[in-house]
Design a protein with these regions (language model features):
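Iron-sulfur cluster-binding electron-transfer modules in prokaryotic oxidoreductases
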Residues: 1-161
Length: 161
């Protein structure tokens, strides 16, 4: 399991079960245990677990026109379900299609919570204490990350033909 030194107490989260993970693979409890391990409080949407609601991407609804002549997008309906839960800090997902669909829908319906991968909540819980006690600036996504040290790169290039 994960090691959290400063729990995300008071953080309000909802989780969207992705279609294939929940309906076909019946994996619904593991993501909830991860949320629980962070110390965040989980608020369930009415349709969750194996009864989850599709984001719309898999059925071609991702290509609906912007005019909404066909009605509200499934992803917007789902974000409204999350909004109906009251104040939320985060809506977490574990599917790349869900991330794209719900991020866009959250902007469209002006949701006041962040849509992101579940792993971002775990990262926050694991690094929060470090960020609170560190004087260093926190990492932001626009900063380059070095995955291989320069010495390792130069050693490798010296031995690579």
């Amino acid at each position: 399991m994960i090691s959290v030194t400063t729990p995300l107490t008071g953080t309000r989260v909802t989780y969207h079960d992705p279609c294939y993970l929940a309906r076909y693979n019946r994996i619904t409890e593991a993501p909830r245990r991860l949320i629980e391990a962070t110390g965040a409080q989980l608020f369930e949407m009415p349709r969750h677990g194996a009864d989850t609601f599709c984001c719309g991407a898999g059925g071609g609804r991702i290509w609906m026109s912007e005019s909404h002549a066909e009605g509200e997008r499934p992803s917007e309906q789902r974000i409204r379900e999350a909004q109906a839960l009251g104040r939320l800090d985060y809506c977490r997902v574990t599917c790349p299609k869900d991330l794209a669909m719900y991020s866009d829908a959250a902007k469209t319906v002006r949701a006041e919570f962040e849509v992101a991968e579940l792993t971002a909540l775990i990262e926050l819980a694991m690094t929060q204490a470090e960020l609170l006690t560190s004087e260093a600036e926190p990492f932001t996504s626009d900063q380059p990350r070095t995955l291989v040290s320069s010495s390792a790169t130069s050693n490798r290039s010296a031995t690579t033909p």
